[in-house]
Each structure stands twice: as C-alpha cells, then as structure tokens.
C-alpha cells in the first residue's frame, strides 16, 4: 500500500502473529530472520545444540508452517543471539541454507564479531572486516547483503568479480 517491496521482521514473525495475516494480501518478499531470544536477552549466553542445524531447522519449520508464499529471503541473523564461534560457523557453512531453495541475506556490516577478531572497537572502523566477510559470503553464493558502507563494499565486490573472471 505504501510502496514497500520487502518486509524484514527480526523476530522471525513471532512478536506479532497478525503480521503474516496482514501481509497475505500484498505480493512482497518477506525476510525470515533468525534471532535467539529478544533484543534485550539475545546476547545473554546464547546456546545451541548445533547452531547450523538449529537455524536450518528453524527456517524449515517456519517455511512449512507459516510462510507458504514463495517470496521468502532467509537471514541467519549474524550477531542476533550468537557468539563469535556461532557467527563464524554460520558464515563458513552458509551454503547449507541454499538447499532450502530461497535467496540468502546476510548482514555482517560493522558487527561485533569483526571487532572481536580484529580488535576494532569502534564499529565505524570495521569496513575492512565487513568487506572480507561479504566477499567470502559472495563466494558461497549469498545473494543479498545488508551493509553500511555501500560504495566501499560495491567497489570491493566489483574488483573481486573482475579478478575472478580475469577479464
């Protein structure tokens, strides 16, 4: 109605059960975002049996039960209820989610895990780490990225692709 092409609900459509009902009449994409807990609790000792498989199962269940519309984009929720190890596991094994048959969106831009690895305490000093993660994820087939420094990341992607194609 107001021109939106995409809805991104960080709760995975859990906070307001009527959200999906209201969206049914609109032919727009829905980002299925994973977050353990709530924004207030998500970083308080997040635990998983197996972070990769737990999130895969979360996506699979949501797709089957609530999101029959095929306009779905998957977001594993880097930094949303995950430790450094969880984030690295998700990034390094992201290609597993392709088997669900939907585009993947990842937001690593300026995330805490980059600062934990590089020592960059100011989030604005994490562009290099953001670019490194985006290029790795791109090499694994991720189609959509949420970033802050659009020009720098776009330039990095263009150069990366040119080098790969060697043309």
What are the residue ranges of the model-derived segments?
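Short loop/turn motifs enriched for small/polar and acidic residues
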Residues: 77-79
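Flavin-dependent oxidoreductase catalytic cores
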Residues: 1-2
């Amino acid at each position: 109605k107001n021109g939106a092409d995409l809805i991104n609900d960080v709760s995975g459509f859990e906070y307001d059960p009527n959200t999906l009902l209201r969206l049914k009449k609109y032919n727009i994409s829905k980002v299925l975002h994973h977050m353990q807990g709530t924004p207030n609790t998500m970083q308080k000792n997040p635990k998983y049996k197996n972070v990769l498989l737990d999130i895969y199962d979360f996506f699979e269940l949501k797709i089957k039960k609530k999101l029959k519309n095929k306009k779905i984009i998957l977001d594993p929720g880097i930094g949303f209820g995950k430790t450094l190890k969880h984030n690295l596991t998700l990034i390094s094994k992201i290609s597993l989610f392709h088997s669900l048959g939907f585009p993947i969106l990842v937001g690593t831009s300026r995330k805490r895990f980059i600062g934990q690895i590089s020592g960059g305490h100011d989030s604005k000093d994490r562009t290099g780490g953001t670019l490194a993660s985006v290029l790795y994820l791109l090499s694994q087939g991720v189609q959509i990225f949420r970033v802050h420094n659009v020009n720098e990341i776009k330039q990095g992607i263009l150069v990366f692709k040119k080098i790969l194609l060697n043309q």
